[in-house]
Design a protein with these regions (language model features):
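Extended, Lys/Arg-enriched charged tracts that mediate electrostatic binding to polyanionic substrates
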Residues: 115-129
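Charged, gly/pro-rich active-site loop segments
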Residues: 105-119
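Helix-start/capping segments and mature chain N-termini
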Residues: 1-105, 127, 134-339
Length: 339
């Protein structure tokens, strides 16, 4: 792509050539369709527009030094989308169909996969919408599955550099037994006000506390949180956190590095004991945290005392990216090569 400066890409939408679509009607999924239009034609009474019957996923494709294109853990995204469907009574898309759609959309748009080590990747966005004209609150009779792609740079402007986050108890991203564990748009809509306030104050994200008691660490903006203390990788266990595929992968890599992995409720007072902390997810990969400001208690916790990423975060980041780009062996079968 001669007109794209790969190293200067932000995390935004750039038009590509094709997307994939599939419809669920009369109790079954149809065939995958290739489309070049960016526009979806849906009825104004569709449940996705009124009652939030919508779910989505996010994954990436990487071009390796060998020129091959690799997609990271798409089977996990397929299974998580099924979980989201169960959570809001949508039709479940078979894992095989999800994977076929991803393979096809990446292959059709392979000229948009950024070159090796440009710092950019091809972001893949699967999306499911409830269709069918209804005014009452009930599950949709029909569904549309869409996958589009766009080349992206780092999610955070600083890239792999520590940034500040804040705690604000006034806001929650999900209810205690609500939809926090699934990937639906409502969770992100609920985070917009707090997120904008945080950005206006100069923070990269909000570190939420649990919505029930406000005692434990929860999600960190649109990503999972983890802390490093000594030889331990510590990440929250909660009924309102999305199970991050990146976090799951990092836990395995941490164990491979000899760290003890702890998944448990983390009292927010433990922040003061962390040697390192970060948020992690498909979009951010790993975004180290330099400082956590508790705006309600007027306290600051400095994590990165020298202003640089910690050694464990840096090792995990380099290891994960090396697997994604094919620079290190894929010992766990996480990568799919697009032929």
């Amino acid at each position: 792509m001669e007109n794209l400066n790969w190293s200067e890409l932000g995390f935004g939408y750039i038009k590509t050539d094709y997307n994939i679509r599939c419809y669920y009607r009369n109790g079954k999924w149809g065939e995958l369709e290739v489309c070049s239009s960016e526009i979806l034609n849906i009825h104004m009474a569709s449940t996705c527009l009124h009652y939030g019957q919508e779910s989505f996923e996010g994954l990436k494709a990487f071009r390796g030094k060998d020129g091959k294109i690799r997609v990271f853990r798409m089977d996990e995204n397929a299974k998580r989308m099924q979980s989201s469907s169960r959570g809001i009574k949508m039709a479940e898309l078979p894992v095989e169909m999800f994977e076929e759609a991803v393979r096809k959309v990446v292959k059709l748009n392979e000229r948009f996969v950024p070159p090796y080590e440009s710092g950019a990747a091809l972001y893949i966005r699967p999306l499911m919408l409830g269709l069918g004209q209804q005014v009452g609150v009930k599950p949709a009779p029909e569904y549309m599955f869409v996958v589009f792609v766009t080349p992206v740079g780092p999610y955070f402007k600083g890239g792999f550099q520590p940034s500040k986050v804040c705690i604000m108890r006034e806001y929650d991203r999900a209810a205690p037994n609500g939809t926090g564990t699934i990937k639906v748009g409502g969770n992100y809509a609920a985070s917009l006000v707090a997120g904008e306030i945080a950005h206006e104050k100069g923070y990269a994200a909000v570190l939420y506390l649990d919505p029930k008691e406000k005692k434990y660490l929860d999600e960190c903006g649109p990503a999972n949180f983890f802390g490093i203390r000594g030889n331990s990788y510590i990440t929250p266990q909660s009924h309102s956190i999305l199970p991050s595929i990146t976090n799951k992968s990092l836990q395995q890599l941490a164990e491979d590095m000899g760290l003890t992995v702890e998944r448990r409720p983390i009292p927010f007072e433990e922040i003061a004991t962390f040697d390192e902390a970060a948020e992690c997810g498909t979009a951010a990969v790993i975004a180290p945290i330099s400082q956590i400001d508790d705006l309600d208690e007027n306290k600051s916790y400095v994590i990165a005392k020298n202003g640089k990423p910690g050694p464990v975060c840096e090792s995990l980041y380099n290891k994960l990216r090396a697997i994604q780009y094919g620079d290190e062996p894929d010992n766990y079968g996480w990568v799919t090569i697009i032929e």
